[in-house]
Amino acid sequence: MHAQSEFLSSLQRQSQHAFQRSGVVLQGEADWQEAILSAFLQTQTTQRWFCVGDWSFESAFCVGMKQGNRLLGRECDVLLFDARKEFDANSFTAAIGSLVGGGMLLVMTNTAQPQHFAEQWMQTQWQKLIVLEQGKVIPQVSELAIAQRNTEYIEQTHAVSLIEKVVNGHRKRPLVLTADRGRG
């Protein structure tokens, strides 16, 4: 368990430094997954955790499987998603929007072979992430390229300066702010 927990901590540090989100699938028995999560959670002192599914971590904000939309407008460093019993795409996509740059998505999946076409398709999608499998060697992950943070928010900085100009200006004029995507 220590090796997997250390791997997750190392990947998290690397992701934060590169300002890139990382996705990890833990595929194995529930006891094995929960032991790794408990060990990894103990290393987390300042990270905000959100959980979607049947979780009850004391230091995390947890919601039910179909309640991922409750995470909208919030931010987290680690998002834990339980896909072992069922998968709700709407809940997943709403919850994933809360993951900050440099954050980590942890997905729990079963070791059982998928029965239906939809489950088979989901299984192939999870394989595109970093997969930690019970009883298998920890995968090698290449170094992440460091993103240029200071140029990322030029439009946001400009928008804030325009808002300040309207608030502090002499005329009472309306402000219209639009964004191409949801969180802007």
Regions from the language model: what does each represent?
Residues 68-141:
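N-terminal accessory nucleic-acid engagement/regulatory domains that precede
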Residues 29-32, 177-184:
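Walker A/P-loop nucleotide-binding motif
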